[in-house]
Swiss-Prot record:
Annotated compartments: Secreted
Membrane found in the keyword field: no
Protein name (record): Interleukin-13
Superkingdom as given in the UniProt entry: Eukaryota
Disulfide bonds: C49-C78, C66-C92
Segment forming the signal sequence: 1-18
Length: 131
């Protein structure tokens, strides 16, 4: 009987350790951004944003959301990416104020918005998978 009780208590304790915890809000926002980018890339019948060009940015920095937003913010009259811009803005504002100020980016390459969105999607999926 004592052994059975010990086993039940041990399983209860280990069960609590193995149960998933709450999903952080950042992960939810990241997942929603990924879903939005998937929708944008899948529904392309015409060139995204009329083939507009944006600066290529280094998405591996700690300011990746702010850098992506900074690159896309200059695109006007493109309703397809407005929601993406708002989502990036929300993710960028999660940074401490000292990190929000964009550093000097090396701006030597412009790419089409469609390619930028595909690259951003690939990068964000990697972040989501690997935490």
């Amino acid at each position: 009987m004592a052994l059975w009780l010990t086993l039940v208590i041990a399983l209860t304790c280990f069960g609590g350790l193995a149960s998933p915890g709450p999903v952080p809000p950042h992960s939810t926002a990241l997942k929603e951004l990924i879903e939005e980018l998937v929708n944008i890339t899948q529904n392309q019948k015409t060139p995204l944003c009329n083939g507009s060009m944006v600066w290529s940015v280094n998405l591996t920095t700690s300011m990746q959301y702010c850098a992506a937003l900074e690159s896309l913010i200059n695109i006007s009259d493109c309703s397809a990416i407005q929601k993406t811009q708002r989502m990036l803005s929300a993710l960028c504002s999660h940074k401490p104020p000292s990190e929000q100020v964009p550093g000097k980016h090396i701006r030597d390459t412009k790419i089409e918005v469609a390619q930028f969105v595909k690259d951003l999607l690939k990068h964000l999926r990697m972040i989501f998978r690997h935490g």
